[in-house]
Structures are given as structure tokens and as C-alpha cells.
């Protein structure tokens, strides 16, 4: 088995999230993947690999996510800190959710205000965005692509180990998702993967 490990996953390590009306420690933490890695190292089932840097992960993500959403994620941390340098010490959590399509607002251009953009692309206030969220999500997508390529090349078993959730925000996958749930599997699933039963 080839196991493609997201070496950047720990860069997405939120401090707090909103849960049932109060701020709590984040539920989705790097330790979740660390436990799996420790077990895989205890009973080796295959090499831990990193994706080839030459993979065109940006093109693959663009096949399943809207360009404005990807552009937002790529610049979100910079924009958050530009609002207030003190934000560098805080995770970004949305506080408003402009429901543009529901209320007939324009959807062809993102809002100029960062807080509105954050809310437009966020699913909830339970998933903070931090300095390393984009790098972690992008590397997770690369892991999914590498595993798909390995399967297409004949590898019987390939795993993308990346704190992955296969379901992006319901019905809004192209333009919003929980940051750690950037739909990493979708680029791989958009490929014509043959059956691996043989």
C-alpha cells in the first residue's frame, strides 16, 4: 500500500471554535492524524510518501471548486491580518453570513469587506481559519491526487492520509466548505478511476 501523508496538516491547528453558543477548544485537531500515523508506524503496511511537487494540484482543485473560492482561501490569512495586525494572534472566524443568492444579491463578485467574504465562503463558525490553513488544504488535495495517480498506475491500495472529510458543505461545494474540508477527494474523484477489484 502506498500512503500519501499530508506533512502540512498540522499547520491547520485552530485555537478555538464556536460550539453551541460558546467558544471551546477546537474539535478538529492535528492529533487526530498523529494517532493514525503512530499506528501505521507501529504496524507498517506501506511506505509513508509525500506527493510529487510536480502535481498540478491547482488545476485539479479548479475543476471542482469555484475560482473565487480558491482565490479567497489563498489570500484569506493575509487579508485577515491586513485588517488589524493583532489578528495575526487570532484565528479568523466568521460573524456574518451574507446569503447572496437567497436574497437576490450579486454573486458574480465577492464582497469587498473581508468579514463579509469570510462569511460568504464559510459554512459555520466552528472551523477557524489560520495562517497555515491554505497550505494544509492544498497539500491535502495533492495527497488525494497522488493516491489517485498511484491507483491509476496499478497500485492495488493507495491512501491519502490528510485529515480529510469526504463531504464538503452540502450543496455549496464549489464556493464554500469548512476550511479543513476543502474537498480534497473531489479532484481525484473527477478522474476516470478504473475499478481496483482485480
Model-derived features: where do they sit?
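HDAC/HDAC-like amidohydrolase catalytic core signature
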Residues: 1-197
Amino acid at each position: 500500500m502506498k500512503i500519501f501523508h499530508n506533512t502540512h496538516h498540522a499547520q491547520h491547528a485552530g485555537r478555538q471554535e464556536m460550539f453551541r453558543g460558546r467558544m471551546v477548544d477546537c474539535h478538529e485537531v492535528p492529533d487526530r492524524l498523529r494517532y493514525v500515523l503512530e499506528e501505521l508506524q507501529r504496524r507498517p503496511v506501506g511506505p509513508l510518501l509525500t506527493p510529487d511537487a510536480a502535481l498540478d494540484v491547482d488545476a485539479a482543485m479548479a475543476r471542482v471548486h469555484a475560482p473565487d473560492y480558491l482565490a479567497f482561501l489563498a489570500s484569506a490569512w493575509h487579508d485577515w491580518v491586513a485588517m488589524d495586525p493583532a489578528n495575526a494572534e487570532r484565528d479568523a472566524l466568521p460573524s456574518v453570513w451574507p446569503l447572496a443568492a437567497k436574497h437576490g444579491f450579486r454573486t458574480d463578485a465577492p464582497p469587498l469587506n473581508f468579514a463579509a467574504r469570510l462569511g460568504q465562503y464559510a459554512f459555520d463558525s466552528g472551523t477557524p481559519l489560520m495562517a497555515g490553513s491554505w497550505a494544509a488544504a492544498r497539500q491535502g488535495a495533492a495527497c488525494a491526487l497522488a493516491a489517485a495517480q498511484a491507483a491509476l498506475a496499478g497500485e492495488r491500495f493507495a491512501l491519502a492520509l490528510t485529515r480529510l472529510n469526504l463531504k464538503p458543505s452540502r450543496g455549496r461545494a464549489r464556493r464554500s466548505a469548512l476550511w479543513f474540508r476543502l474537498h480534497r477527494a473531489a479532484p481525484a474523484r473527477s478522474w476516470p478511476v478504473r475499478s481496483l477489484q482485480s
